[in-house]
Amino acid sequence: HLKDGAPKAGVARVTAFETGTNAWRRLPDWPACSSPGCAVTPTPLYLRAGRSLGFAAPVPGDAPFDEYVSDPATPVPYRPRPVLGWGYEDDNGWSRWLVEDQRHASARPDVLTFVSEVLSGPLKVAGRPVAHLVASTSGTDSDWVVKLIDVFPDEVPGRPEMGGYELMVASDVFRGRYRESFETPKALAPGEALTYRFALPTANHVFLPGHRVMVQVQSSWFPLYDRNPQTFVPSIFEAKPGDYRKAVQRVFHEPGRASFVELPLVTAP
């Protein structure tokens, strides 16, 4: 209020929407737990053998990696096909792609899907998840897409359309040629396991009891992100048809070469 002596407006310094619980939260600051008595702990959520996901690190004897074939001729679409509408009209899909059901991707052989056990209690993340991927490619360039997903129970009372729904919480892509420098792109060594570390967008989300956590890894996200020929060329915009080649992609999950997503877990109220 501009008027002297007017009552305080009661506006919080930060008002943030919390997905999962679907509630507005009044916060003294952001990140959500920068206030006394509240702690955010960066916690690795490991990709494990058997396409599982958990907070326990891989152990000796586990299968060392999972692999898939990435083909630029059949890229993973960013949303289910057919993709209709590109404007911002009410009947188009563009405005809803961030909450699109990801089952269209998890069913593909060129997408690795890792899933946790059913949660017995709420799991809250507030901040930026960070992907730590140890991966190799048979090509000389590669894209790595990591998606953090909330998997709903098979049955949701009162909302049957949400049964088994795979809701994207945070996701991003990293182009391998920029692993060492954005200014000086560099070809990847075929077959060499390299570490890729990149932050996903900020999330303020609660995975509810009965839900599961999922991480998807893929190498295309078309047409949201342009296709990588998977052969290093000075400029992808000038890539020739012959530069676009299939590649075998491996994601490692063994001691010493563990892949994980670091979650900003809220560990106190």
Regions from the PLM with identified roles:
Residues 1-269:
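C-terminal, loop-rich substrate-recognition/catalytic regions characterized by aromatic stacking residues
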